[in-house]
Amino acid sequence: MLENKIIFVAGACGRIGKALCKKILQNKGIAILADINENHLSILKTELENEFKKELLSLRLDITSKESLNCAIDQAFEKYSKIDGFVNSSYPVGKDWGKIAYYEASYEQICESLNLHLGGFILASQEFVKFFKKQSYGNIINLSSIMGVFAPKFENYENTTMQSSLEYSVIKAGINHLGAWLAKELFNTNIRVNTLASGGILDNQANIFLEKYRKCCASKGMLDAEDICGTLVFLLSDESKFVTGQTLVVDDGWGL
């Protein structure tokens, strides 16, 4: 589905990013690996090159830096002469992320979370839109979450050390609307923008949480990163050429 398509993946070393890069390569596309962590990036590059017997471009990328974004875009274009799609699966967090409850968080801590994550997604989309306008076409997919679409099921967190972060929900809701706003503003430019809101991704969560979460779903419950990659490939392919401005939910029915 992605033959000869050049796909720039930000956050390539995360669970979803890594799974997506593999899926792109399996579908005969070319994945550009971009991440802020150079050590993880080097490991991923070696792993994928060994598995797929193909030389890949890896780039250090900080989505909160316009200079970093432009440098990465320039390097990608210099190598491939085009970028067909941009997927942002980055997950920038502040030093206190996940450590402080909402009611105890300071203004500065709240702003740090919003600025890094939502601000970074806005900035990255801004720079890729500029590039895609010059190229005369493009495809942007931002990764979001069901937490930006539905209210949390707070009861699932009872008797665990986990919590539902208000900042996270606000960030993801903002990313959803970023996609709709951009898609509408970019009518008649041959640039599509969509958002994928995924259900929870398995990451060694407590069994009590997993059991409660599973009861809210149709068949599996928490998903593996690979479970959402088919939808991402569809959005990156020409099969979805008339899909824009949408937030596609992949959550095994959790939101019902």
From Swiss-Prot:
| Protein name (record) | Post-translational flagellin modification protein A
Q: Give the originating organism.
A: Campylobacter coli
Q: Which family does it belong to?
A: Belongs to the short-chain dehydrogenases/reductases (SDR) family.
Q: What Pfam families does this protein's entry cite?
A: adh_short_C2 (PF13561)
What does the record give under GO molecular function? oxidoreductase activity, acting on the CH-OH group of donors, NAD or NADP as acceptor
Q: Which SUPFAM superfamilies match?
A: NAD(P)-binding Rossmann-fold domains (SSF51735)
Q: What keywords are annotated for this sequence in UniProt?
A: Oxidoreductase
Do you know which PANTHER family this protein is assigned to? 3-OXOACYL-[ACYL-CARRIER-PROTEIN] REDUCTASE, CHLOROPLASTIC (PTHR42760:SF40), SHORT-CHAIN DEHYDROGENASES/REDUCTASES FAMILY MEMBER (PTHR42760)
